[in-house]
Design a protein with these regions (language model features):
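Anionic, Ser/Thr-rich low-complexity intrinsically disordered regions
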Residues: 28-230
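Residues marking helix boundaries in flexible regions
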Residues: 21-22, 28
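Cationic, amphipathic, low-complexity segments that mediate targeting or membrane/lipid association
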Residues: 2-5
Length: 230
């Protein structure tokens, strides 16, 4: 199959995040490219507001995989900033507790969306018959996509550090080196996800959808919560 270089170049004012994906021209790697583009756009969209209470303007049709990817990265962006806020040493304890509970709910919502992405893949591959020697991956495709979403946020924020005019040259240089590593990681992860999807489609690997057991949110499995009910 003919190989190609797919380039996405984004800047803070227009589009942002620089990544080069070396892959093959097939539908699976096009999906990975779509993830990168949507995550980059959504990260930028959040930072137009830079407010954890902002209401997103989702441009995608409800129920589509694009819609799920947008909502996934939006939740990640909001939670990123909630984690920043809760680490303020001067935060009011009452506010911190409320925020911690909000973060717990966000984690559950995030997990639910990841499982929605895995359900999409499971339905996509339902007619694929795995080969006799097919193997399973250490993580499902959606949890790898989850890491790709977080990487988009890391790259954005590290790029902001590189652009700071109030920082020392040493800080800018250090962050520039970290940014280069993050971009390399994004390229490698994108390639790995594409290869995993190709292997699943070819029956070389198979996947399972494990429903995550968030025990701390469940009144039946969190001992502190179920003790209250006795």
């Amino acid at each position: 199959m003919e190989k190609y270089w797919r380039n996405f170049a984004f800047s803070v004012d227009e589009h942002y995040l620089c990544v080069i994906i070396h892959s093959q021209t097939n539908i699976m790697n096009i999906f990975v490219s779509k993830c990168i583009e949507i995550f980059a756009d959504t990260t930028l969209h959040y930072h137009k507001f830079d407010n954890i209470d902002a209401k997103p303007e989702n441009p995608y049709q409800a129920g589509t995989i694009d819609d799920v990817l947008f909502r996934k990265n939006w939740i990640d962006a909001v939670q990123w900033h909630m984690e920043d806020i809760i680490r303020d040493p001067n935060i009011d304890p009452v506010d911190a507790l409320a925020l911690k509970r909000r973060i717990d709910k966000s984690n559950q919502d995030r997990t639910d969306l990841v499982e929605d992405i895995d359900t999409y893949f499971r339905d996509l591959y339902k007619d694929v018959v795995p080969s006799a020697d097919a193997t399973i991956n250490t993580e499902s495709p959606a949890w790898a996509v989850d890491r790709l979403s977080i990487l988009a946020l890391k790259i954005y924020h590290m790029e902001q550090e590189v652009k700071r005019t109030d920082a020392t040259e040493a800080h800018v240089a250090k962050c520039g080196a970290k940014l280069a590593v993050l971009l390399e990681q994004q390229k490698d992860l994108s390639t790995a996800i594409g290869q995993l999807l190709d292997d699943i489609a070819a029956g070389k690997k198979y996947m399972k959808v494990y429903r995550q057991m968030k025990m701390y949110n469940d009144a039946d499995t969190n001992p502190v919560l179920y003790a209250k009910g006795k």
